[in-house]
UniProtKB/Swiss-Prot annotation:
GO MF, one annotated term: G protein-coupled estrogen receptor activity
Membrane topology, record value: Multi-pass membrane protein
Subunit-structure text: Homodimer. Heterodimer.
The protein's role, per its UniProt record: Membrane G-protein coupled estrogen receptor that binds to 17-beta-estradiol (E2) with high affinity, leading to rapid and transient activation of numerous intracellular signaling pathways. Plays a role in the embryonic development of sensory and motor neurons. Specifically induces apoptosis and reduces proliferation of brain cells. Involved in maintenance of meiotic arrest in oocytes.
PROSITE patterns the UniProt entry points to: G_PROTEIN_RECEP_F1_1 (PS00237), G_PROTEIN_RECEP_F1_2 (PS50262)
Transmembrane segments: 41-61, 82-102, 113-133, 161-181, 203-223, 246-266, 293-313
Cytoplasmic side: 62-81, 134-160, 224-245, 314-353
Recorded GO CC terms: axon; basolateral plasma membrane; cytoplasmic vesicle membrane; cytoskeleton; dendritic spine membrane; early endosome; endoplasmic reticulum membrane; Golgi membrane
Protein biosynthesis recorded as keyword: no
Source organism per UniProt: Danio rerio (Zebrafish)
Protein name as catalogued: G-protein coupled estrogen receptor 1
Swiss-Prot/TrEMBL keywords: Apoptosis, Cell cycle, Cell membrane, Cell projection, Cytoplasm, Cytoplasmic vesicle, Cytoskeleton, Developmental protein, Differentiation, Disulfide bond, Endoplasmic reticulum, Endosome, G-protein coupled receptor, Golgi apparatus, Membrane, Mitochondrion, Neurogenesis, Nucleus, Postsynaptic cell membrane, Receptor, Synapse, Transducer, Transmembrane, Transmembrane helix
Record gene name: gper1
Protein origin, superkingdom: Eukaryota
Tissue: Expressed in brain regions that are known to control reproduction and sex behavior. Expressed in ovary, muscle and intestine. Expressed in early germ cells of the testis, including the spermatogonia, spermatocytes, and somatic cells such as Sertoli cells.
């Protein structure tokens, strides 16, 4: 009798342990499913906002910059040439972003070709954008400190050569991480990330820290030069407007790309403090919603550049008004667009600082 009682108790204990283990597992499962569902809903909402408000501006705006400037090749200035190349880089990222922002479950990362292809586009755009903005800051400093008629460095031939070298440098800087980017698997989740410690340091250093140090130095010198130029009242308004556009472009780039670089830097610092974490899952896996937000912020830069270029660039507004005048079928359309672009555009000399 005692033996039967013992067996019953043993069966009850075993069954209770199995039930508790199963219950704990189910609770954990439900919690993970709830967190995943919340991330998906919030991420989908943010992606929809980006697609409705920013993507059309970035896609149409960058195409418009290319079309308008290519239709006025004879009036293209050196800053225009740099902004055309910047628009090409931005257009690549904007087109890529439409796939990225809705890829919340990372399904296409199952395919190594797509993983590599998307990473290539992102890297080329990042490097080309920051390299062009860095060079534009240097070009602005040269324009302000040199006589436009006698500056041997600031010519259209040199500008075209500079653009070619910048694209080559962007591609070369991309090749190293491009060759080692691969899919990473964590259970049933797939991630595409160049999770190599040295490569990540390279991205943050030459793609963010060094360029912005150069930009900061250039603008410090530009501010000092402009303060000295206040005596020449005729030059000050024109130089101030040209400087305003490039400062806003760089500032927007910094605000948009800073979160992602901070996100990467945190992972790098964790790997420095504990080398065993260098092979662990990335922060994009541990904090998917934060990773999604910093990606959207980075994509937003390429969407905002056309707005800055259109409203702050008087040369572009002038060209856009002429382009609309030629293409518009109805005078009402032309008058509306002409009023929107600002009727009072001051007369400028052919060379623009």
């Amino acid at each position: 009798m005692e033996e039967q009682t013992t067996n019953v108790i043993q069966i009850y204990v075993n069954g209770t342990e199995q039930f508790n283990a199963s219950f704990d597992f189910n609770i954990t499962d439900v919690k993970e499913s709830t967190d995943t569902y919340e991330f998906y809903i919030i991420g989908l909402f943010l992606s929809c906002l980006y697609t409705i408000f920013l993507f059309p501006i970035g896609f149409i705006g960058n195409i418009l910059i290319l079309v308008v400037n290519l239709n006025h090749r004879e009036r293209m200035t050196i800053p225009d040439l740099y902004f055309v190349n910047l628009a090409v880089a931005d257009l690549i990222l904007v087109a890529d972003s439409l796939i990225e922002v809705f890829n919340l479950n990372e399904k296409y990362y199952d395919y190594a070709v797509l993983c590599t292809f998307m990473s290539l586009f992102l890297q080329v755009n990042m490097y080309s954008s920051i390299f062009f903005l860095t060079w534009m800051s240097f070009d602005r400093y040269v324009a302000l400190t040199s006589s436009m008629s006698s500056s041997p460095l600031r010519t259209m031939q040199h500008a075209k050569l500079s653009c070619s070298l910048i694209w080559m440098a962007s591609i070369l800087a991309t090749l190293l991480p491009f060759t080692i980017v691969q899919t990473q698997h964590t259970g049933e989740v797939h991630f595409c990330f160049a999770n190599v410690f040295e490569i990540q340091w390279l991205e943050v250093t030459i793609g963010f820290l060094i360029p912005f140090s150069i930009i900061g130095l250039c603008y410090s010198l530009i501010v000092r030069t402009l303060m000295r130029a206040q005596k020449h009242k005729g030059l000050w308004p024109r130089r101030q407007k040209a400087l305003r556009m490039i400062v806003v472009v760089v500032l927007v780039f910094f605000i948009c790309w800073l979160p992602e670089n901070v996100f990467i830097s945190i992972q790098l610092l964790q790997g420095t403090a504990d080398p065993s974490k260098r092979t662990d899952t990335t922060l994009w896996h541990d904090y998917p919603l934060t990773g999604h937000i910093v990606n959207l912020a980075a994509f937003s830069n390429s969407c905002l550049n056309p707005i800055i270029y259109s409203f702050l660039g008087e040369t572009f507004r002038d060209k856009l008004r002429l382009f609309i005048k030629r293409k518009a079928s109805w005078s009402v359309v032309y008058r509306f667009c002409n009023h929107t672009l600002d009727l009072q555009i001051p007369v400028r000399s052919e060379s623009e600082v």
